[in-house]
Amino acid sequence: MILLEVNNRIIEETLALKFENAAAGNKPEAVEVTFADFDGVLYHISNPNGDKTKVMVSISLKFYKELQAHGADELLKRVYGSFLVNPEPGYNVSLLYDLENLPASKDSIVHQAGMLKRNCFASVFEKYFQFQEEGKEGENRAVIHYRDDETMYVESKKDRVTVVFSTVFKDDDDVVIGKVFMQEFKEGRRASHTAPQVLFSHREPPLELKDTDAAVGDNIGYITFVLFPRHTNATARDNTINLIHTFRDYLHYHIKCSKAYIHTRMRAKTSDFLKVLNRARPDAEKKEMKTITGKTFSSR
């Protein structure tokens, strides 16, 4: 299985090139790039007001207001410090870098810029991990509508944090492959007792969401992660956040890969069958043609 990159490579490569050219004393060049990411996220890299010595990285998330309610602004301020500026119109967060005043730790700055989406997501997880560490119960469940028709729920208890993703399968084939995929997660936990518990429910929401307006339907699935203190403590939580916030994309990416692999195998098998049929086809009988005098025609 393939782990999706947590960081955004386009941001990192673009900034790294800009920093490298600036450090070498090269003349700065204009940049204007707009690109998308999973979950409807949109990025924009540009020179504000046409100033080529400044590079702005902006991100747009449809659900950013929900993340703000869980401390996203504070977390970003802590991580990015003076690089965080007022967002440009149409975007939620903007980072500004001055090529004439390069930071000392360029590699670290570039990497953190590439983690912008992850760091926006991180606030809700850090908040509920902290609730669990402090033994708080009864806190309101976090509800993040991270896609138009899909939702993430986060809830903390004294001994665990429960994260539930709702997801929509486009067709029946996706449901079948998704179930097989989730069964592999259950089997994997038997091999590693430190892995979190993973549950999958189809059509109906899990018991944790019985009192909510969670969607119900034949194409609806719910994936539940039960995270224990060994997954949420200060040492492990960064890696946990890196992995869990991309899980929905990870699942659907592998469903698409599985379907593509199956189609490739089917086409290859069909090609093999056609070769067998062609070999089994009887050769057409050649008729001997003669002239009126009895001579045989010969092909040249």
Swiss-Prot record:
Main location, first listed in the record: cytoplasm
InterPro entries, alphabetized: ARPC2, ARPC2/4
UniProt keyword annotations, A-Z: Acetylation, Actin-binding, Cell projection, Cytoplasm, Cytoskeleton, Nucleus, Synapse, Synaptosome
Domain of life: Eukaryota
Location of N6-acetyllysine modifications: K275, K295
GO cellular component: Arp2/3 protein complex; cell leading edge; endosome; focal adhesion; glutamatergic synapse; lamellipodium; muscle cell projection membrane; neuron projection
Family the entry assigns: Belongs to the ARPC2 family.
Name the record gives this protein: Actin-related protein 2/3 complex subunit 2
The species this protein was found in: Mus musculus (Mouse)
Lineage: Eukaryota, Metazoa, Chordata, Craniata, Vertebrata
